[in-house]
From Swiss-Prot:
Component of the large ribosomal subunit. The ribosome is a large ribonucleoprotein complex responsible for the synthesis of proteins in the cell. Keywords: Cytoplasm, Endoplasmic reticulum, Ribonucleoprotein, Ribosomal protein. This is Large ribosomal subunit protein eL21. Residues 112-146 are annotated as: Disordered. The keyword Phosphoprotein does not apply. GO terms for cellular component: cytoplasm; cytosolic large ribosomal subunit; cytosolic ribosome; endoplasmic reticulum; ribosome; synapse. The gene is Rpl21. InterPro entries: Ribosomal_eL21 (IPR001147), Ribosomal_eL21_CS (IPR018259), Ribosomal_eL21_sf (IPR036948), Translation_prot_SH3-like_sf (IPR008991). Residues 112-123, 136-146 have a biased composition (Basic and acidic residues). It comes from Rattus norvegicus (Rat). Belongs to the eukaryotic ribosomal protein eL21 family.
Length: 160
C-alpha cells in the first residue's frame, strides 16, 4: 500500500500526551502572556485540535509577530528543498511555550552590565568576551610508594 497524504500522517507519538498528563489542559497554559518579538517553541498538543500547527513545524522555534484573543502569529523558518523560507503561521496558545534558548544570553548581558558598572566605578578595564578554559595548573601526582609503570604499544605483526 502507498502512504496516505493526510495532514496528521505519522504523528502517532508526536501529538500524543505524555504519561499521566492526559485530560484537561492546565490553566497556566492560558495564563501565559505573549508579546510581539517573543521567541517561542512550537509543540503540538493533541488534546486541542483547534489551531494546531502542521507537523512540519513541530519542535521549531519562531518569533511572535501578531497576537489575537486565542492565537498568536509566528514567523518560523522552513526548509523547502534548497531554500529556507520565513513562513507566517497562526497557532493557538496551547501549542506554544516561551523558549529558553535566549535565557542564557540575557543572563550573560545582565552580568556584563553589572561588571561594566563596577569597572566604571573603580576606573578599571574589564574583560567581557568569553574566554576558553586555560590549561590546568602544574601539580604533583602521588604514587604512594609505587613505581610508575611504563606502557608501550605492542608491535604490529602480520599474520597470514
Amino acid at each position: 500500500m502507498t502512504n496516505t497524504k493526510g495532514k496528521r500522517r505519522g504523528t502517532r507519538y508526536m501529538f500524543s500526551r505524555p504519561f499521566r498528563k492526559h485530560g484537561v489542559v492546565p490553566l497556566a497554559t492560558y495564563m501565559r502572556i505573549y508579546k510581539k518579538g517573543d521567541i517561542v517553541d512550537i509543540k503540538g498538543m493533541g488534546t486541542v485540535q483547534k489551531g494546531m500547527p502542521h507537523k512540519c513545524y513541530h519542535g521549531k522555534t519562531g518569533r511572535v509577530y501578531n497576537v489575537t484573543q486565542h492565537a498568536v502569529g509566528i514567523i518560523v523558518n522552513k526548509q523547502v528543498k534548497g531554500k529556507i523560507l520565513a513562513k507566517r503561521i497562526n497557532v493557538r496558545i496551547e501549542h506554544i511555550k516561551h523558549s529558553k534558548s535566549r535565557d542564557s544570553f540575557l543572563k550573560r548581558v545582565k552580568e556584563n552590565d553589572q561588571k561594566k558598572k563596577e569597572a566604571k566605578e573603580k576606573g578599571t578595564w574589564v574583560q567581557l568576551n568569553g574566554q576558553p578554559a586555560p590549561p590546568r595548573e602544574a601539580h604533583f601526582v602521588r604514587t604512594n610508594g609505587k613505581e610508575p609503570e611504563l606502557l608501550e604499544p605492542i608491535p604490529y605483526e602480520f599474520m597470514a
